[in-house]
Amino acid sequence: MKQILSGMVFLCILLCCVSCTEYTPKPRGYFRIEPPQARYQVLPLDSLPYSFNVSQLAIVELPEIGSPEGWINLSYPSLGVKIYCSYLPVTRSTLQIAENESRSLVSRQAKQAKAIKEQAYSNPDERVYGSLFLLDGESASPVQFMLTDSTSNFFRGALYYDCVPNADSLAPVTDYLRKDIIELIQSFSWKK
């Protein structure tokens, strides 16, 4: 009797294991990303023609030798992100060219983005004027900005991820860095 009962239990277990032909895939999950509280310090480079507050989480990188003067990268290794910043000395005639090129770079990202929101910025006391571009959707560069004094200086920045962008999973990082970029813009000043 025990042998029959043991045989039936073994047969039931065997049937349960091999009878299922439909597999249920597990949904993809993403790591929870919680950026730390933002703390800022003044950009620690006196040789640049501008100054702004930068997150203490960011590492300021100077580009390779031979890169134009005033270019820097703000790297966030713990978040896998860089903000590429470029500076151009301009004249009134080349300022329009720099602004158009900056808008063109934003437009190229619009092919992947659902929408572009532009926010104008003006600080007459520091002679800083510009625009912040927020790109919604699957864009490799969801936040870009440009700043100028409207006479001789032009500064541009673009946020890029070190991975294939997925707007939903990267939303906490994008929001955190958008706030960092807004702090950068609001604290920006020209040294000349």
Describe these PLM feature segments.
Residues 1-9:
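Bacterial N-terminal signal peptides that target proteins for export
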Residues 48-103:
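Secretory pathway targeting signatures of secreted, lumenal, and periplasmic proteins
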Residues 83-92, 143-145, 167-175:
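Second-shell loop/turn segments in exported
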Residues 158-192:
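Surface-exposed amphipathic alpha-helical segments
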